[in-house]
Amino acid sequence: MPVCNFFLQGRCRYGDTCWNEHPTGGRGGDYRGNQQPSNRGGFGNRVWINPSQRGGGGSSSAGGSNEWGRGAASARDVQSSEFSFSQNRFSALETQRAGAEDTHTTLDTIQKEMEVWQTSGQWPFSCYSAVNRQISGFIELCPEELRLEYYTSRASGDIQPYINSVQQLANQWRSRVQELRNMSSSTQISVIAELKSSSPPASAPGFGSPGPGFGSATSGFGNTSLSSPPAGFGGAGFGSGPQSSSTFSFAQSKTDFGASNTQQASGFGSSAFAQPSSGFGNPAPSAASFSFAAADSESKPSAGGFGSASGFSFKTATAGQGSGFGSGFGSSSGFGSSSGFGSSSGFGSAFGSAAPAQSSSFGSTGGAADTQSGHGLFTANSELTPEELKEFMAKRFTLGQIPLRPPPADLLMI
């Protein structure tokens, strides 16, 4: 590939996309010095000049041409070595990427973004990073975390600590944003030192920080105790103190997800399944989290897994009546017949335990009594109108006149 003459002169407009070679370092001079003399007055994309038109005379045209070519190459070698190939317009971009970020530009960016953050009404409780490191003084909280803290405070009967904590965090955010928006010289020095520091950034204080935050031992997000043993989902989570209830436990002492419990909440990872009282750590008479049957006032405190008493009840069980989805796999059949697996209750309590109930939410032991009722699988002939009976007896239904009730049992062909 020929060497680019304009690159040697320092004015190649194509840069790295040039079709000719751009030698780097000391290769250019060595490459041209090792070339054989040429009668064209040079090589590459240089223009040949007639030696007779120069001051050398016609008799020495060949020799003059060779001398001129070598002389031009030597001159260009000196020019290229002095220029150091810095005329490439794309090298400035590489130098900019390799260099450090401009400090003043970074500070101006921080000030503008603080102004936008303060006036735009965006979510305030969020961290902030200008380049690749976080700026201290901000706390990261999502709306769901605040909502959970509100529900926890409301369940305890006192929401004033929650209100005070949110107001304190909002005031801290406003003061920090105002400080970064109107930086003093000391603030600029501290921000620059923080951006250039190699140590990990200090974590922002959470709800459980000293002061009127979201409490110390009662909060689920950053309590003061750091020495409590870690637990799964049910233990003292998120750094809470010992003997405190977890935020996400199904068996807290005071929460919306479970009833009162005199013991420490165990949750998924502790001894909830080994205790006689269950339902994810709750005692049997209390309400479990996601069960389908309400608590029976006279039921026995047997072990109740998924079938214990529920806060999301679909049917309230009374003292002589079975709960819907209540008993285990063996119960009187949900549709009237007896015993799927051997015990008696409507779909049973937790996985096979006995229940004093006899009836089911899906049906009773009456059997044929419900099959002929309007709420069963079939409809009696006496309850159908002549038009409906005619439609059931026809080979095809008439559009717009299809009955909305089940057909009689004697018209079904199995």
UniProtKB/Swiss-Prot annotation:
<feature type="region of interest" description="Disordered">
    <location>
        <begin position="200"/>
        <end position="221"/>
    </location>
</feature>
<keyword id="KW-0479">Metal-binding</keyword>
<feature type="repeat" description="FG 16">
    <location>
        <begin position="351"/>
        <end position="352"/>
    </location>
</feature>
<feature type="repeat" description="FG 11">
    <location>
        <begin position="325"/>
        <end position="326"/>
    </location>
</feature>
<keyword id="KW-0811">Translocation</keyword>
<feature type="repeat" description="FG 17">
    <location>
        <begin position="362"/>
        <end position="363"/>
    </location>
</feature>
<feature type="repeat" description="FG 8">
    <location>
        <begin position="268"/>
        <end position="269"/>
    </location>
</feature>
<dbReference type="InterPro" id="IPR000571">
    <property type="entry name" value="Znf_CCCH"/>
</dbReference>
<feature type="repeat" description="FG 15">
    <location>
        <begin position="347"/>
        <end position="348"/>
    </location>
</feature>
<dbReference type="GO" id="GO:0051028">
    <property type="term" value="P:mRNA transport"/>
</dbReference>
<feature type="zinc finger region" description="C3H1-type">
    <location>
        <begin position="1"/>
        <end position="25"/>
    </location>
</feature>
<feature type="repeat" description="FG 9">
    <location>
        <begin position="280"/>
        <end position="281"/>
    </location>
</feature>
<dbReference type="GO" id="GO:0031965">
    <property type="term" value="C:nuclear membrane"/>
</dbReference>
<keyword id="KW-0863">Zinc-finger</keyword>
<feature type="repeat" description="FG 1">
    <location>
        <begin position="43"/>
        <end position="44"/>
    </location>
</feature>
<keyword id="KW-0653">Protein transport</keyword>
<keyword id="KW-0813">Transport</keyword>
<feature type="repeat" description="FG 2">
    <location>
        <begin position="207"/>
        <end position="208"/>
    </location>
</feature>
<keyword id="KW-0677">Repeat</keyword>
<dbReference type="GO" id="GO:0015031">
    <property type="term" value="P:protein transport"/>
</dbReference>
<feature type="region of interest" description="Disordered">
    <location>
        <begin position="24"/>
        <end position="73"/>
    </location>
</feature>
<feature type="repeat" description="FG 13">
    <location>
        <begin position="335"/>
        <end position="336"/>
    </location>
</feature>
<feature type="repeat" description="FG 12">
    <location>
        <begin position="329"/>
        <end position="330"/>
    </location>
</feature>
<dbReference type="GO" id="GO:0005643">
    <property type="term" value="C:nuclear pore"/>
</dbReference>
<feature type="repeat" description="FG 3">
    <location>
        <begin position="214"/>
        <end position="215"/>
    </location>
</feature>
<keyword id="KW-0472">Membrane</keyword>
<protein>
    <recommendedName>
        <fullName>Nucleoporin NUP42</fullName>
    </recommendedName>
</protein>
<comment type="subunit">
    <text>Probable component of the nuclear pore complex (NPC).</text>
</comment>
<keyword id="KW-0509">mRNA transport</keyword>
<feature type="repeat" description="FG 6">
    <location>
        <begin position="233"/>
        <end position="234"/>
    </location>
</feature>
<keyword id="KW-0906">Nuclear pore complex</keyword>
<feature type="repeat" description="FG 14">
    <location>
        <begin position="341"/>
        <end position="342"/>
    </location>
</feature>
<feature type="repeat" description="FG 5">
    <location>
        <begin position="221"/>
        <end position="222"/>
    </location>
</feature>
<feature type="repeat" description="FG 7">
    <location>
        <begin position="257"/>
        <end position="258"/>
    </location>
</feature>
<keyword id="KW-0862">Zinc</keyword>
<dbReference type="InterPro" id="IPR051767">
    <property type="entry name" value="Nucleoporin_NUP42"/>
</dbReference>
<comment type="function">
    <text>Required for the export of mRNAs containing poly(A) tails from the nucleus into the cytoplasm.</text>
</comment>
<dbReference type="GO" id="GO:0005049">
    <property type="term" value="F:nuclear export signal receptor activity"/>
</dbReference>
<feature type="repeat" description="FG 4">
    <location>
        <begin position="238"/>
        <end position="239"/>
    </location>
</feature>
<feature type="repeat" description="FG 10">
    <location>
        <begin position="306"/>
        <end position="307"/>
    </location>
</feature>
<keyword id="KW-0539">Nucleus</keyword>
<dbReference type="GO" id="GO:0008270">
    <property type="term" value="F:zinc ion binding"/>
</dbReference>
